[in-house]
Amino acid sequence: MTSSAPVGVFDSGLGGISVVRQIRTDLPHERILYFGDSANAPYGTKTPEQVRDLSFRIVEDFVEQGAKAVVIACNTATSSAVQELREHYDIPIIGMEPALKVACDRGHGERQSVIVAATPLTLRERKFAALMHRFEDAHTIHKQPCPRLVEIVERGELDDHDLVMRTLHDYFDQYDLAHTDSVVLGCTHFVFYRDYFRELLPNNVAIVDGNEGTARHLEVVLESLGKLAPEEQDGGVILRNSDPGERIAELAQQLLER
């Protein structure tokens, strides 16, 4: 497999396009195949077995298209499927997890109060429980499932300011935000809400996501294998979705260019 081969990126729907944008910024010569599984969204309310089955189908398709690596741009699919995918395929499988370590490290040893916003399944899975166990003794960590934030993106309602702010208040008004240090956006869909979160949260509260770290991890892995795209290659993105409707295709393109 050559360095000019594409990178496959997938998500339960449209949220992973936020990761594609980061990869395109950091690795502009890479060719990216994006698959959004909007016909089966959301993953966050499915069983781990269902998510694993869907993930294997998608990765198998990427392999058939000659992908040199796959990025699971979905915290939920990472939690449910990444280990088995790595055992089954001989190409790099890059996963994601909520950037809890980044949020806790911001305190430089001081106790941090952190809210992790994610899908219900991500927060229930053993992978997140193990991650949380590493930090919960030294920090105050709140888990906040936010399934409606996924639905708003998938319905194309991201620009409905009143709806979004009302939804955020429903989820976060229960917290003492003035004494919160960070909110972790533990779902790639949620990165599209960054400006809304900034409006909701006091200025001292950091908003943390895992997209930069994921793109950086991909770069390190490809470089170690000698598989970074050649600089003379024109990068690009091909968007595909399990929902064949024109509306989804238009929405995906809008999010890519947002």
Swiss-Prot record:
Record key words, sorted: Cell shape, Cell wall biogenesis/degradation, Isomerase, Peptidoglycan synthesis
Biological processes annotated in GO: cell wall organization; peptidoglycan biosynthetic process; regulation of cell shape
Tree of life domain: Bacteria
Gene3D superfamilies for this protein: 3.40.50.1860
Active site: C74 (proton donor/acceptor), C187 (proton donor/acceptor)
Pfam families hit by this protein: Asp_Glu_race
Reaction it catalyzes: L-glutamate = D-glutamate
EC numbers on record: 5.1.1.3
Family as reported in the entry's similarity comment: Belongs to the aspartate/glutamate racemases family.
Reported function: Provides the (R)-glutamate required for cell wall biosynthesis.
Molecular function terms from GO: glutamate racemase activity
Entry protein name: Glutamate racemase
Pathway: Cell wall biogenesis; peptidoglycan biosynthesis
Sites where the protein binds substrate: D11, S12, Y43, G44, N75, T76, T188, H189
